[in-house]
């Protein structure tokens, strides 16, 4: 299963807000076949969202997963994710890397644990402002990819999300042609470093809205989007999904 549009709610949502969200989404989504769409609510709301989204085909994922289980207070194991019905997990979001000091090696272990148990992975990479200004984005991304993914056997259950840190919540979206070139670079590096020469789908994340989605989705190597703030509004999320479905028509 290939996921194209994913909403990352981060630490947002409430029981009432989630109910309103699903109503807005249902009223605005154009197609009943939405199996390539997904959201990552806070873990505590996953069961509620499964019930609210029942019959829609909307996938539910976790925002993070741990590499093992047991005496790890606050961690969420792969088994727990699967048990509550998650079909995938984000791994490596910049906020996890920064706030929880997760290294490339830590993230590699998470990817391995998820793949061994059949949980799909959306692996996040992205450069900080300093690398963007210094024009060393490719070198930074290559290091993240090689240290986390080298010699792993990847399949269609693995997706990359390119999320430049400096573009998160800033309304500073890179030029679509620059994003496209970066996505092509990412695909080439993953293809060359993975054990089976796998070329992944690459989603873009960083201030994606319905206003810039059409321009982004026209690019050859932008396969979809990982959406933050805009995904908190059910109507806005549906509009972005509709734009992606109708791209090139």
Question: What does each of the following model-derived ranges do?
Answer:
Residues 1-249:
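Active-site loop-to-helix "anion-binding N-cap" substructures in soluble metabolic enzymes
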């Amino acid at each position: 299963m290939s996921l194209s549009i994913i909403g990352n709610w981060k630490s947002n949502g409430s029981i009432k807000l989630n109910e309103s969200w699903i109503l807005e989404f249902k009223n605005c989504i154009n197609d009943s076949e939405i199996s390539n769409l997904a959201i990552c609510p806070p873990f505590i709301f996953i069961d509620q969202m499964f019930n609210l989204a029942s019959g829609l085909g909307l996938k539910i994922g976790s925002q993070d997963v741990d590499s093992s289980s047991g005496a790890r207070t606050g961690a969420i194991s792969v088994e727990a994710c699967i048990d509550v019905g998650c079909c995938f997990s984000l791994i490596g979001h910049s906020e996890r890397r920064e706030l929880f000091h997760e290294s490339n090696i830590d993230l590699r272990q998470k990817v391995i644990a998820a793949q061994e148990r059949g949980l799909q992975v959306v692996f996040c990479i992205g450069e900080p402002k300093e690398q963007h200004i210094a024009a060393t984005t490719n070198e930074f991304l290559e290091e993240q990819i090689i240290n986390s993914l080298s010699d792993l056997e990847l399949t269609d259950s693995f997706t990359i999300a390119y999320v430049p840190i400096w573009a998160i919540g800033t309304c500073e979206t890179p030029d679509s042609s620059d994003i496209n070139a970066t996505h092509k670079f990412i695909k080439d590096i993953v293809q060359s470093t993975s054990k089976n020469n796998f070329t992944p789908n690459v989603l873009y994340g960083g201030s994606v809205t319905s206003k810039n989605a059409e321009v982004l989705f026209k690019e050859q190597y932008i396969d979809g989007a990982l959406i933050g703030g805009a995904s908190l509004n059910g109507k806005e999320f549906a509009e972005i999904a509709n734009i992606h479905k109708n791209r090139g028509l």
